[in-house]
UniProtKB/Swiss-Prot annotation:
Entries under Pfam families matching the protein: DUF2714
Protein name as it appears in the record: Uncharacterized protein UU049
Amino acid sequence: MKKNKSNLTPTTNYFDVFNTYKEKKASVDLITYEELMASVLFDNKLGFESEVYLDFVKKFTLAFEKKLDIWFENFIINFNLNLKFSTTIMIPILVTKANSTTDAINFRNDQNPVYNNFLISYNQKIKKLLLQNHPVQILPHLILFKSNLNGSLVLVFSEKIIASIEQKSGN
């Protein structure tokens, strides 16, 4: 009796960790970052060149560069390791509690009343769109949606937002 060699050869299945992001990005139901911001800015009588919006962009750019937590009204984005993806790459994940070892960008509220109203509107718009089951690109390279499987929030991301951790020798 001859053995079938194809049954003995191990196979490797490749998992594209960015596939869900790509699918959501291509979805007709997606509310893009530009659409979300245009709506929030319009509601607050602001523009893409306004000081409020430019400050907002500066803050999330800093958070992306330094991998700082980003606080929203109903969730927090934290950059951390997730073994499902890699042992050396930091990815954005949703958490419910602030990280005590990382500084954070606050997108919940602000002392400046104009900026505070902008943030309130931004968070309310995200919440409303999620309740309507729209995937929402809350920031560039980050899409948030409600899972059809369990109703929880899911955050997917592009490869442009991850960071590799370098191990320094001798430390």
